[in-house]
Regions:
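Conserved Switch II/interswitch segment of TRAFAC-class P-loop GTPases
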Residues: 82-101, 111, 126-132, 155
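Generic enzyme active-site microenvironment
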Residues: 62, 88, 121
Length: 204
């Protein structure tokens, strides 16, 4: 759970094929070192990341999911109540890019009645000489799916991703505060109208 003023959990899930670097991105974003050895995630887990926005403290729980196909039905269980969904592909692996459509459609089906921020990350940009899909094409795909887009390398430049992640957090919090303020104003207007109607009925 988060320790922010709203008292609600700010859930962020990372989705994509096995080996694209979801775990690495999460770990470097919370200050851990990049690990050169690769071990595929075999369980769902989350890592808390704290951030200050407008002098308030917020905690976002970064959920690391299992990319293997045989675990996909299990992963779907954790889509609910996600505030931010980050789809990750490996820029050197065309299959991981092509399978983004599966992940996006899967989330859209599960969260059809929920509002959330989408982002697509092209990881392993340090291997640009082996690029299997152009950055321009990937960005156009992201835009067509209503998602933010960024290429980065968890290995060589983790700050690029960390800063991008903070931008997503800030966008979510500010939009949430805006919606809450708007709802509060509507409630005040409704209450004022009720009070006026009560006063009129008493006068009669």
């Amino acid at each position: 759970m988060s320790d922010d003023n709203s008292g609600t959990e700010n859930k962020v899930i990372f989705l994509g094929e096995a080996g694209v670097g979801k775990t690495s991105l999460i770990k470097v974003s919370i200050g851990e070192k990049f690990e050169t050895t690769y071990n595929s995630s075999i369980s769902l887990s989350y890592f808390p990341r704290k951030i200050n926005i407008n002098n308030k403290k917020y905690t976002f729980n970064l959920w690391d999911t299992i990319g293997q196909e045989k675990y996909r039905s299990l992963t779907k269980i954790f889509y609910k109540k996600s505030k931010i969904v980050i789809f990750v592909y490996d820029i050197t692996d065309i299959n991981s890019y092509n399978n983004l459509k599966y992940w996006i459609d899967s989330v859209n089906n599960e969260l059809s009645n929920e509002k959330y921020i989408k982002a697509i990350i092209g990881n392993k940009s340090d291997l640009f000489l082996k690029e299997a899909i152009s950055e321009k094409e990937a960005e156009e795909f992201a835009i067509s799916n209503g998602a933010k887009f960024k290429t980065c390398s968890a290995k060589t430049d983790p700050l690029v991703f960390t800063n991008f992640l903070d931008q997503l957090f800030t966008e979510y919090i500010l939009e949430n505060e805006k919606n809450n303020n708007s709802q509060n104003e509507q409630n005040i207007t409704i209450n004022n109208k009720k009070n006026k109607n009560k006063s009129k009925s008493k006068c009669c």
